[in-house]
Design a protein with these regions (language model features):
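Conserved class I S-adenosyl-L-methionine
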Residues: 1-36, 38-45
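Class I SAM-dependent methyltransferase SAM/SAH-binding core
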Residues: 50-95
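A short acidic, Gly/Pro-enriched loop at the edge of an enzyme's catalytic core
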Residues: 97-104
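Residues lining the SAM
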Residues: 108-109
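A short His-aromatic
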Residues: 113-114
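SAM-dependent methyltransferase
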Residues: 118, 138-177
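A short glycine-rich, Lys/Arg-flanked "PGG" loop and its adjoining helix->strand segment in the class I
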Residues: 121-133
Length: 177
């Protein structure tokens, strides 16, 4: 999966322009405020850093981790261009090698769906270890219905003047790739 995102890094946000990042970021900001979260956050599977940047602009101290080095390069470049300070690290969600703890951990865009089943328990243990006592774990995941009924054995395409994107998925007994 990392290799696919490596190749998408320059086009990721462009191809996801239908995702309302500002509204979704506002949803996170409202939720974090309502839950009384502290100001130090970790985003797992941060990709190009859209949520890290939005939360940093709102005064949060953000760290983003992702497996894809090119996506992290893009994230760091966009953060610099937007004048926000975010730390980015290449890391596997099942490892999360940093020792510090965070007030909250975000994992939007169903990033935990991309973790192989045998690594998922370690990923959740690492997420818990990275949270301060009482910290907030906020993740979304795709349902079995979506994966089996909408994504599996399907093709997705986006043809634009600058780029054409084709993705194929296959259903396996324990996962969709």
């Amino acid at each position: 999966m990392t290799q696919a995102y490596d190749h998408l890094s320059e086009w990721f946000e462009y191809l996801n322009d239908d995702c309302d990042y500002p509204a979704w970021s506002q949803y996170f900001l409202s939720g974090l405020a309502a839950l009384g979260a502290g100001r130090k956050g970790l985003e797992v599977g941060c990709g190009s850093g859209a949520f890290c940047r939005a939360l940093a602009k709102a005064g949060y101290e953000m760290t983003g981790v992702d497996l894809s080095a090119p996506m992290l390069d893009k994230a760091a470049r966009l953060a610099r261009e937007e004048g926000v300070r975010v730390r980015f690290f290449q890391a596997d969600a099942a490892v999360l090698p940093m020792r510090e703890q965070f007030d909250f951990l975000l994992a939007p865009n169903d990033c935990y769906n991309y973790i192989m089943p045998e690594k998922l328990p370690a990923a959740f243990r690492k997420a818990a270890a990275r949270l301060k006592k009482g910290g907030i774990f906020w993740a979304d995941v795709s349902s079995a219905y979506k994966l089996r009924g909408k994504v599996a054995n399907n093709m997705f395409a986006d043809d634009r003047d600058e780029v054409t994107y084709l993705a194929f998925s296959r259903l396996f007994p324990d996962r969709v790739e």
